[in-house]
Structure formats: structure tokens, C-alpha cells
Amino acid sequence: MVRSFFRTYNECYDGKVYNFVPFTKEEIEEEIDQVMGQLDKRLCCVLMDSDNEIAAFGVAIPSLSKAMQKAGGSLFPFGWYHVLKALTDFTYLDLMLEGAAPKWQNTGISAVFHGMMAQQFQDCGARWALANPQIETNTAVNVWGRYEHELWRRRRCWIRKIK
């Protein structure tokens, strides 16, 4: 199922998001070994279709920002305590990945998916979810318009050819 997740991830962003680079097989194996075991299942959601294929997915992690601020940016000598405590406190979540398989895009599956994720987050005690930077030209992020939200950070990149 994990390899299927990465295949769906590559399919849902490839050619749709500017400058997207798909995971290679080697990178997928490395991510499986290093990251997948660390994720909290309560903060992840995978919707399967009737063919047992991934229709939509989402991965969130507890935010470590405040913990690293308290630790002064260092794990030692006592910063590790703040990080471990933050991993069990779900007040703030960082939304890492979200997507839908190409055949399920624009079908309303995002409404089902976001409803399930919101309920899971509330059950864990989360009050805030912070999305990672999103390209303004990515129309799929329009889903946030249905939620009470505040744009509090904007990042832009301009491209200029050097002659």
C-alpha cells in the first residue's frame, strides 16, 4: 500500500504543479525506510475506491515549530524534551501532503476527504492546521475557500533569465 501511495502521489502532481519532480524508485524506498514508520496513523488519511486503489490521501504531523523555538533551535542538552512533548500535543498540525488520484480529481472527493480529516484532527484535539506553501496557480488549492481561514504568509518566486 505504501508504494501505491507514492505512485498515486507522483500521478496526482506530475504535470499539474510547476517544477514538480516525481519520486524515483530509490527515493521511494528511502522514504519508506526513514519516514513512513514515524507517521502517526491518527493524522493520516487514505481513501480507497472500489478497486482497492488509492482515491485520495493526506498526511499531517504535529507542528514542531514552537518546540524548536523553546529549545533555542537545539536538541541538546534539553531541547529533545520539548520536541518529544510536541509530538504528543496536537494543538497545531502541519499539513504535509494532500492529493487525489487523477481519475478522482474534480469529482467532489475533496469534500469527503477534508471532512474525514477535519474529524480526525478534532478527535486528536487539534485546533489549528497549517498548510505548507502552495503555488498560487495551483487551482486545486481552492478547496480552502470553504473553510474559515486566514492567509498569513505568501511566498513568490520570480524567474529571470540571466544573459
Which stretches of residues belong to each language-model region?
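Conserved acetyl-CoA-binding loop-helix of GNAT-fold acetyltransferases
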Residues: F78, Y92-A101, Q105-F121
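Short conserved micro-motifs at the rims of enzyme active sites and ligand-binding pockets
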Residues: Q69-A71, Q105-G108, N142
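C-terminal "cap" of GNAT-fold acetyltransferases
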Residues: R154-K163
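Conserved acetyl-CoA-binding loop of GNAT-fold acetyltransferases
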Residues: D123, V143-R154
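Conserved GNAT acetyl-CoA-binding A-motif
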Residues: T91-L93, F121-I135
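Conserved beta-strand-loop-alpha-helix junction that forms the acyl-donor binding cleft
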Residues: A100-Q105, A131-V141
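A conserved beta-strand-loop-helix scaffold within acyl/acetyltransferase catalytic domains
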Residues: M1-G99
